């Protein structure tokens, strides 16, 4: 599944508030789930008479379904035969199901998963004989359907049959749910679709809903006879018209390969498809979308074909299904989902129209598509055995999307983008005490939902990138191929991957090295010193708060790491020197020529660590950048900026070093270093906002841009990907920090659109809407709202939301949040985007916080505490607080609402961030204000 960062907040997960906020949905949008109300789901009947609340023959204290969240290993599913009939008029669905299972030991009970289903029939058959059911009932605490039997099952084959019904979900858009859209004639059209990862298949049909319980699926879907189609993971086998009734058609699909329940997909819709395109392997790649959007699927189809061809060649294993479908869903809780053979997307993640979509949108479509197709192997073909190894799915897919696009879109320099897309944001989280290891124990749905986060996706991909660099690309590829070959159609654990990579890793112990990065949180700070011809390296744990207390014994490795150190030097800037700093060693060293003037450690930032240098070594690097920055690769320039800002924040170096480093930026033309600078300057401004140094800080940033922003910056007719991206970043940065020519241009283009209907260039719209709307009145706000309601392009709508939430009118922002409650105004999938947009507006931050406090109970009722984005809304809103009063408010709020659900980790992160902000303001705000007063020129831009 594509998390595309809640840094991911945005498709351009990196570029400031404007572009960043617009794509919030790309990150950490996922699913919603609420715990069952037992009273609602105990209405059951069976072919055998029993009391629905009858207890098991076992004492309650010994009942396995009561004491264990995990399923029993005694019953293994082999084949599901599932027939679902969604009624798009009533919003209900029925389920007829038969499960063939293997019984591995004699038991007189069976339990499997259900949630929000009403089971009306439970039949157990073995060797052609019905086994009398003693009782059948729901156990909501663990989301089980329990069947106790009059006699024990024998070892061997067994069949379970169920009838059930449920509601097509409308608000949480997980499980089997209803999605709506407006047709060209303004008619509301309905479709039924599904999203089962991680624990929502049980909301559609009784099942053994754990990833290790792989089985084959024979799916039948009932659809309206005319106009509608039915889609599932496999291709259609046959269709029976007027079945089960008039004007209905039952569509039967071929039996699937073995797969986990969360990968199954059911869709009944009235969409159309573009002509199929064949892969080099020969299977068709199809794309589907609603009326008016189908042509905008062409780019995704093209990327899909090229990506799938790359993966077949790279992995050395053919795609195992007879077809591959991609479909754009109007209401979708995450960026996309890798259902095997039927990949579902949020529309904003997959639609691209040349000439009216931006390069940011294009990148998002390409990244999301490549990510999901990597899952066809990592996740679908080979699946983690349990959710504690989720990173095997998501970390690998997140890295492979970059390898694929390096081949598909070579001019994009995707490995350079990896730094600001993935690496820097995960370092930001992982340098806190509230982080967690990549591999961690999870047991219940809230914990499972919670680990679909930056650590699983972005840290996972970052350490894989590091490991490939350690091993070499060819050896890494061979190890991956070996792993996939052995575990295809099976489940695997982290140690299995290490074992296969070890075969091609030479003398390096993959397990010993990588366990220090996957089984403990955090990362090292490498301190570099020069003594004659020796460059020495030492390590310590890096924390954003360098004075924080922690117990090294909390980690099995005592927060030390095996570090593969690479570096380049002034004498040979295109060559790489390397050594190992082992976790129990006091130091390591590399010899260099005595004439060496500078060294840059962690070449291309492939290592997962930060680097600090002695003052003279920092000065030598800064001098080189000012003299000729191109001697260092853009990845190294971005790395230096990222480390320098963070090291100053954690008090390892002074801000004078960081500000000196930025002097070279007048010569910088690559968008990745500028993207990193924007992110860091915006974070620094958040801390300075409301302090004496804020105005001078804005003036300082404007001085950095004096030679960078010209009239040409607003001309994006040349669609060179890298050039357009740097213009987007510079325009956004200039507007954000008050460059007058930027703000006036944004307002000019906005008013021109309002007056003449001529839209700004697609690549400028995010900036124009965001900053052009800052100072408008109610009339212009209403005008933008009308345009938002009339707009059919979901990507364009997201940009408009960014403008609607940017006004400096508190009353209007309050009204906006109230309007967003109504799903007729804002789709449920975009609701939290609106809140975060308002919170990212300095005027709107207290408005959004007050809104959350006043509406919390209603939000819990609407979304449930298992909703991942809801779980992260608190740190998203509160991360800019920096006073003791606000800290107390947040603590009191948590005390008033102690049940965090999937937001428990987010709450810890919020508190730690606020505490660190308070510490920073107390330590740095005054001296930084004094430095700015002395060093900022009177001349302004």
Place the predicted regions along the sequence by residue.
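Ligand-binding face of N-terminal immunoglobulin V-set domains in extracellular IgSF glycoproteins
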Residues: 94-115
């Amino acid at each position: 599944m594509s998390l595309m960062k809640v840094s991911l907040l945005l498709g351009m997960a990196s570029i400031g508030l404007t572009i960043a906020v617009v794509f919030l949905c790309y990150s950490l949008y996922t699913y919603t789930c609420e715990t069952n109300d037992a009273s609602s789901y105990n209405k059951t009947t069976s072919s055998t008479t029993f009391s629905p609340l009858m207890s098991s023959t076992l004492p309650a204290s010994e009942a396995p379904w009561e004491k264990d969240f995990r399923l029993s290993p005694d019953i293994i599913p082999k084949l599901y035969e599932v027939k679902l009939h969604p009624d798009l008029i009533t919003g209900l669905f029925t389920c007829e199901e038969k499960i063939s299972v293997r019984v591995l030991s004699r038991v007189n009970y069976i339990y499997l998963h259900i949630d929000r289903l009403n089971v009306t029939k439970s039949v157990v058959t073995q060797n052609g004989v019905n086994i009398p059911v003693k009782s059948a009932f729901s156990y909501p605490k663990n989301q089980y359907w329990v069947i106790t039997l009059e006699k024990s099952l024998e070892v061997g084959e067994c069949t379970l049959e169920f009838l059930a019904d449920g509601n097509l979900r409308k608000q949480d858009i997980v499980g089997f749910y209803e999605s709506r859209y407006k047709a060209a004639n303004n008619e509301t059209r309905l479709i039924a679709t599904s999203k089962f990862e991680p624990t929502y298949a049980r909301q559609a049909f009784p099942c053994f809903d754990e990833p290790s319980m792989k089985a084959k699926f024979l799916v039948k879907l009932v659809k309206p006879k005319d106009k509608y189609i039915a889609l599932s993971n496999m291709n259609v086998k046959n269709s029976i018209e007027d079945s089960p009734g008039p004007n209905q058609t039952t569509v039967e699909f071929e039996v699937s390969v073995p797969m986990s329940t969360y990968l199954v997909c059911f869709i009944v819709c009235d969409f159309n498809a573009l002509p199929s395109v064949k892969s080099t392997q020969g299977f068709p790649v199809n794309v589907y979308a609603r009326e008016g959007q189908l042509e905008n699927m062409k780019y995704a189809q093209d990327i899909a074909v090229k990506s799938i061809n790359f993966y077949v060649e790279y992995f050395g294993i053919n795609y195992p299904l007879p077809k591959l479908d991609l479909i754009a869903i109007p209401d979708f809780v995450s960026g996309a989902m890798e259902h095997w053979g039927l990949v579902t997307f949020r529309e904003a993640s997959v639609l691209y129209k040349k000439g009216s979509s931006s390069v940011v949108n294009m990148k998002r479509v390409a990244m999301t598509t490549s990510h999901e197709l990597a899952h066809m192997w990592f996740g679908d073909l080979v699946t983690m055995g349990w959710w504690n190894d989720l990173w095997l799915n998501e970390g690998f897919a997140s890295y492979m999307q970059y390898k694929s696009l390096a081949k598909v879109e070579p001019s994009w320099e995707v490995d350079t983008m990896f730094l600001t897309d993935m690496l820097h944001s995960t370092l930001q989280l992982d340098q806190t005490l509230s982080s967690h290891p990549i591999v961690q124990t999870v047991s219940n749905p809230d914990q499972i939902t919670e680990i679909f986060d930056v650590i699983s996706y972005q840290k996972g991909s970052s350490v894989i990138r590091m490991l490939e660099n350690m091993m070499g690309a060819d050896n890494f590829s061979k190890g991956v191929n070996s792993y996939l070959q052995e575990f295809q159609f099976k489940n695997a654990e982290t140690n299995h991957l290490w074992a296969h990579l070890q075969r091609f890793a030479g003398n390096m112990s993959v397990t010993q090295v990588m366990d220090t990065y996957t089984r403990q949180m955090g990362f090292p700070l490498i301190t570099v010193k020069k003594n004659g011809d020796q460059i020495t390296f030492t390590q310590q744990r890096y924390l954003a708060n360098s004075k924080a207390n922690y117990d090294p014994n909390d980690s099995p490795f005592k927060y030390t790491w095996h570090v593969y150190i690479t570096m380049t030097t002034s004498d040979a800037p295109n060559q790489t020197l390397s050594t190992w700093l082992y976790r129990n060693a006091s130091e390591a060293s590399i010899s260099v020529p005595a004439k060496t003037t500078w060294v840059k450690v962690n070449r291309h930032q492939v290592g997962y660590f930060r680097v600090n240098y002695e003052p003279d070594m920092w000065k030598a690097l800064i001098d080189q950048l000012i003299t000729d920055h191109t001697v260092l690769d853009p990845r190294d320039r971005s790395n230096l900026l990222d480390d320098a800002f963070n090291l100053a924040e954690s008090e390892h170096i002074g801000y004078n070093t960081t500000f000196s480093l930025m002097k070279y930026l007048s010569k910088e033309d690559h968008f990745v270093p500028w993207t990193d600078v924007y992110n860091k300057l915006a974070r620094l401004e958040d801390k300075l906002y409301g302090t004496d140094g804020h105005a001078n800080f804005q003036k300082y940033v404007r001085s950095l841009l004096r030679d960078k922003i010209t009239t040409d910056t607003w001309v994006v007719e040349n669609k060179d990907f890298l050039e357009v991206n740097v213009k987007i970043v510079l325009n956004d940065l200039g507007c954000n920090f008050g460059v007058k020519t930027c703000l006036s241009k944004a307002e000019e283009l906005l008013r021109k659109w309002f007056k003449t209907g001529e839209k700004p260039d697609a690549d400028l719209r995010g900036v124009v809407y965001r900053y052009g709307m800052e100072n408008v009145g109610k009339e212009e706000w209403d005008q933008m709202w009308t345009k938002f309601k009339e707009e059919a392009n979901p990507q364009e709508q997201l940009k408009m939301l960014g403008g609607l939430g940017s006004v400096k009118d508190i009353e209007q922002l309050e009204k906006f949040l109230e309007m967003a409650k109504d799903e007729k105004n804002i789709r449920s999938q975009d609701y939290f985007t609106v809140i975060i947009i308002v919170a990212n507006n300095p005027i709107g931050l207290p408005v959004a916080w007050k809104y959350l406090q006043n509406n919390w109970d209603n939000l819990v009722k609407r979304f449930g505490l298992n909703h991942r984005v809801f779980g992260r809304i608190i740190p998203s809103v509160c991360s800019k607080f920096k006073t003791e009063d606000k800290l107390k408010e947040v603590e009191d709020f948590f005390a008033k609402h102690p049940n965090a659900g999937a937001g428990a980790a987010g709450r810890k992160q919020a508190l730690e961030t606020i505490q660190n902000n308070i510490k920073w303001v107390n330590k740095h705000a005054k001296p930084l204000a004094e430095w700015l007063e002395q060093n900022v020129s009177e001349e302004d831009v």
